[in-house]
């Protein structure tokens, strides 16, 4: 992770510093240091996405663009006119912050703004700022402790990333012909990072996603530091779970698109006399960049613009109304372009699709689950700040987002493609739409030094900041929550069973080297091979964004697998198949005389076609709770992704708690000479052993104790009968851990304990 941080800082810090200087000439080094990583990363996303959109992306051209961007940034921050009065507005403000006096007489506004910002900088609570920065650093904890992320979305992003590395565009991989329609910035920047550091595509996606979250957090600290609420920004973000949960679930583009909110908060939450034309340009640039990352970011920033316009046109000052009209023009241009693309390019393909609500109405229960405490405090903040311009903008921004969530209430509505597109785009908006607006509102109220703008010029702003008792209590809650979150992150780094691929799947990638022809892979998360050797074609691809598929072998190959259509595989030169212990195709191939294991690692298998039908077929038997009286039934987290069950395993698996001695009843078929047990280790128990009084050549064996799926094979003693396997443990007590699957509904246990889940037995003769 350190290498990733160094590369990202080295390439984005100077451009971000320059953009921070332009958008906020009053910023000092501390504020620029907070803003630069986020603004620089936003520019890198926009630049990389633009190159891919223009179909000219390459590693070399990307580096040329990075160098050019840094040269422009260097000139921006170093070149100044010797005559202060002839400098640009942001440069004159910068000079005013350093006590320089311009020759022009029109410096009243500049001096007033400089005075306000200098007061904010003097009143900073540096220890609290330091605490906020440390809290933000926890976003980098997971990629430091583990290699690959949890969730399933990252696998699709990794496949896209690898295609950009190899092909320079989002063409479909393997035996498929077509392309993906997906925002280009994230996969292209991940590809650049992967190529630069020689990283696995999945690792690059993982690290860039968490780096994006970190920069969003410190960027918001920098943006709200302009209002004297920098430290409170991170504390307010800590009251919600939304963006953190989305990052944990590997929804990285949605999180990265929040970088546009940093620009929005920095430029749109300020008095009219402090707004300049380059702020409008900055917002327009941010809209373009976030639209290339993920459309949700552009929608959210667009609604912030709308909120700003709604309150700007009601201000009494004519200058304010002119500014509001200019912003309205900008918003109209982007909205027109966005709707044109949606209606002409994307939406027609969704004409037959109904409005979709995968996770329910996002403005209801999901909002409360992921942002409940933050929402409660924000309601109080909205009341307290109702007479201020900044408070009204933030409140209206949240209200507009909430109204947007109503699209999920009309689930099933057809023939309105724009609504269908919105419902698919915003299917999980409770995790990423409301977190920042609510946190901004809370931070402005939380800070005791914030100076906000009265909505009515003739009136003085009458509002009181958050009571100190409440402020310190909430600070304690956030610190405690951060400690718990860090502890959970450390615990989960030892739970690879939560990954959407098994350890064997990853280990088996090396066996793919040198294979001629194409390889059949399952059309499921564990079947999408993002790191296949160059030239090797696999059959399955992830459904990400809109898939334009003109040719594919996946369906025909799957039918051929289940019907033993060997002619098909010979004609297509598809002589190998790759299966995961997480999937179901393995059971069909194992019992077919036309497929033979070529390489096996912990249940993951590379199969070779045997056209003569002379492969030795094992006997497979499922294990259920009736075979293990001391086990408890636990749901299979992947039960909804398994559509065939020839072993009658059902939706549950027998789970043996660490420290519990148990007997597993088995019945060996006649002629069996070897038994293989497939099991899933939950957590990292000290050690687990299996023994049998008869039936095994060696009566005592140690099983693997690392998290995830494993396969252990034992030679049988054919002169005796085996009826019972006894499992014992080195430790007498199981270790507790917080199981995130209990929150998502994929499991029923939240406060879980370590142990093993039995899957099935394979008898070889």
Task: Say what each PLM segment does.
Residues 1-122, 339-346, 447-450:
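Membrane-embedded, hydrophobic transmembrane alpha-helices
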Residues 328-336, 448-488:
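Signature aromatic-anchored transmembrane alpha helix within multi-pass, membrane-resident enzymes
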Residues 155, 210-213, 299-300, 418-462:
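Hydrophobic/aromatic-rich transmembrane helices and adjacent perimembrane loops
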Residues 459-460, 466, 476, 480-634:
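Extracytoplasmic
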Residues 261-280:
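Membrane-interface transmembrane helices that cradle and orient dolichyl/undecaprenyl
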Residues 1-3, 142, 149-154, 178-183, ...:
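Transmembrane catalytic cores of multi-pass membrane glycosyltransferases
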Residues 52, 279-295:
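Membrane-interface alpha helices of multi-pass inner-membrane proteins
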């Amino acid at each position: 992770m350190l290498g990733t941080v160094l590369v990202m800082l080295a390439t984005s810090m100077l451009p971000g510093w320059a953009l921070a200087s332009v958008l906020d000439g009053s910023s000092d080094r501390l504020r620029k240091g907070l803003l630069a990583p986020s603004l620089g990363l936003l520019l890198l996303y926009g630049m990389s996405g633009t190159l891919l959109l223009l179909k000219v992306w390459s590693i070399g051209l990307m580096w040329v663009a990075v160098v050019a961007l840094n040269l422009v940034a260097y000139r921006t921050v170093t070149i100044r006119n010797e005559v202060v009065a002839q400098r640009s507005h942001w440069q004159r403000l910068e000079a005013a912050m350093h006590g320089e006096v311009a020759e022009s007489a029109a410096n009243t506004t500049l001096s007033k703004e400089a005075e306000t910002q200098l007061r904010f900088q003097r009143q900073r609570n540096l220890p609290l700022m330091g605490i906020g920065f440390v809290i933000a650093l926890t976003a980098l904890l997971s990629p430091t402790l583990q290699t690959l992320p949890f969730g399933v979305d990252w696998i699709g992003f990794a496949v896209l990333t690898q295609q950009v590395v190899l092909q320079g565009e989002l063409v479909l991989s393997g035996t498929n012909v077509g392309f993906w329609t997906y925002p280009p910035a994230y996969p292209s920047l991940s590809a650049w990072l992967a190529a630069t550091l020689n990283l696995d595509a999945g690792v690059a996606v993982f690290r860039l996603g968490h780096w994006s979250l970190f920069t969003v957090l410190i960027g918001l600290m920098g943006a709200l530091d302009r209002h004297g609420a920098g430290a409170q920004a991170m504390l307010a973000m800590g009251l919600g779970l939304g963006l953190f949960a989305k990052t944990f679930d590997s929804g990285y583009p949605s999180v990265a698109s929040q970088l546009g909110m940093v620009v929005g908060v920095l430029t749109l939450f300020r008095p009219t006399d402090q707004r300049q034309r380059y702020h409008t340009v900055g917002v327009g640039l941010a809209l373009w960049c976030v639209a290339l990352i993920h459309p949700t970011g552009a929608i959210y920033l667009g609604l912030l613009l709308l909120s700003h316009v709604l309150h700007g046109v009601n201000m009494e000052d004519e200058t304010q109304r002119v500014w509001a009209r200019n912003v309205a023009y900008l918003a109209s241009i982007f909205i027109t372009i966005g709707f044109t693309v949606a209606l002409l390019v994307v939406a027609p393909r969704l004409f037959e699709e109904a409005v979709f609500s995968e996770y329910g109405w996002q403005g209801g229960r999901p909002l409360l689950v992921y942002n409940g405490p933050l929402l409660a405090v924000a309601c109080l903040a909205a009341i307290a700040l109702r007479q201020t311009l900044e408070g009204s903008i933030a409140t209206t921004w949240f209200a507009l987002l909430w109204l947007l969530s109503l699209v999920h209430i009309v689930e099933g509505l057809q023939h309105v493609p724009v609504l269908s597109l919105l419902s698919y785009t915003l299917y999980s908006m409770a995790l990423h739409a409301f977190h920042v607006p609510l946190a901004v509102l809370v931070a402005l109220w939380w800070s005791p030094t914030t100076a906000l703008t009265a909505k009515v010029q003739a009136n003085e702003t009458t509002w009181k900041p958050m009571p100190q008792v409440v402020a310190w209590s909430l600070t304690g809650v956030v610190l405690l929550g951060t400690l718990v979150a860090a502890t959970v992150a450390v615990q989960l780094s030892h739970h690879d069973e939560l990954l959407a691929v098994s350890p064997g799947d990853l280990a088996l990638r090396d066996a793919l080297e040198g294979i001629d022809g194409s390889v059949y892979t399952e059309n499921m998360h564990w079947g999408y091979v993002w790191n296949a050797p160059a030239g090797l074609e696999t059959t399955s691809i992830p459904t990400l964004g809109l898939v334009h598929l003109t040719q594919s072998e996946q369906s025909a190959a799957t039918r051929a697998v289940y019907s033993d259509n060997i002619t098909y595989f010979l004609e297509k030169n598809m002589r190998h198949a790759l299966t995961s212990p997480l999937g179901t195709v393995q059971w069909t191939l194992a019992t077919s005389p036309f497929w033979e294991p070529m390489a096996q690692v912990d249940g993951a298998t590379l199969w070779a076609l045997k056209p003569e039908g002379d492969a030795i077929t094992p006997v497979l038997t499922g294990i259920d709770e009736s075979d293990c009286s001391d086990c408890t039934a636990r749901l299979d987290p992947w039960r909804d992704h398994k559509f065939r069950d020839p072993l009658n395993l059902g939706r549950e698996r027998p789970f043996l708690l660490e420290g519990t001695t148990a007997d597993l009843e088995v019945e060996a078929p006649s002629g069996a000479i070897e038994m293989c047990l497939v099991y899933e280790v939950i957590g990292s128990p000290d050690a687990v052993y299996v023994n049998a009084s008869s039936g095994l050549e060696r009566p005592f064996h140690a099983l693997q104790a690392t998290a995830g799926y494993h396969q252990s094979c034992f030679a049988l003693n054919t002169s005796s009968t085996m009826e019972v396997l006894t499992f014992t443990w080195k430790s007498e007590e199981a270790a507790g851990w917080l199981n995130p699957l209990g929150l998502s509904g994929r499991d029923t246990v939240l406060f879980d304990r370590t142990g093993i889940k039995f899957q099935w037995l394979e008898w070889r003769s």
